[in-house]
């Protein structure tokens, strides 16, 4: 009798572990969202989809194999206009220097859009030739003009837009 009671509890717990994430996923990616972003790492594109229609498609740079861009479901967060760049506390950035807002060498350029804190962003680039390549340390790079255009669209949609990143 005691074993059956514990099996029931474990079964209920397992059901919750499976059902709750599915429900959260469904609410996160509701089809009634007016805008969403789809990133294809393989195609090196970022699509803005509004009411089911592709409104814009942008070329992007993605993470190198040694520093891949994360895949999964996210929401855009804070939009930081004219950001400074502070080297993250990672090995690859050990000898890099702080870059003030507006500096030509600032890798963020005009805007950075948070999508997975603390180190993954969509942002402009000071190396537009990297678009279409696996060139970043995990962030999604866009030309400065495209990044600004995307940031304005996200702001117009309320600031927190669902985003899927897939291979």
What kind of feature is each model-predicted range?
Residues 2-17:
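N-terminal Sec-pathway targeting helices
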Residues 4, 21-91, 97-117:
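Cell wall/extracellular polymer interaction/catalysis modules
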Residues 11-14, 66, 75, 127:
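Polar low-complexity intrinsically disordered regions enriched in Ser/Thr and small residues
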Residues 14-17, 34, 151:
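Low-complexity, intrinsically disordered short peptide segments enriched in small/polar/basic residues
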Residues 30-32, 71, 90-167:
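Exported/periplasmic cell-wall-interacting domains
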């Amino acid at each position: 009798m005691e074993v059956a009671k514990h099996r029931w509890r474990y079964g209920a717990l397992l059901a919750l572990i499976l059902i709750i994430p599915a429900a959260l996923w469904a609410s996160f990616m509701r089809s009634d969202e007016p805008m969403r972003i789809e990133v294809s790492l393989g195609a090196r594109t970022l699509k803005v989809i509004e009411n089911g229609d592709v409104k814009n498609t942008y070329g992007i740079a993605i993470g190198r194999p040694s520093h891949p861009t994360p895949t999964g479901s996210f929401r855009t967060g804070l939009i930081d206009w004219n950001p400074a760049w502070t080297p993250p506390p990672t090995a690859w950035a050990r000898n890099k220097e702080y870059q003030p807002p507006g500096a030509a060498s600032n890798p963020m350029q005009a805007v950075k859009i948070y999508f997975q804190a603390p180190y993954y962003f969509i942002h402009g680039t000071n190396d537009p030739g990297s678009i279409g390549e696996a060139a970043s340390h995990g962030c999604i790079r866009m030309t400065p003009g495209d990044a600004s255009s995307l940031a304005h669209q996200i702001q117009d949609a309320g600031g927190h837009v669902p985003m899927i990143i897939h291979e």
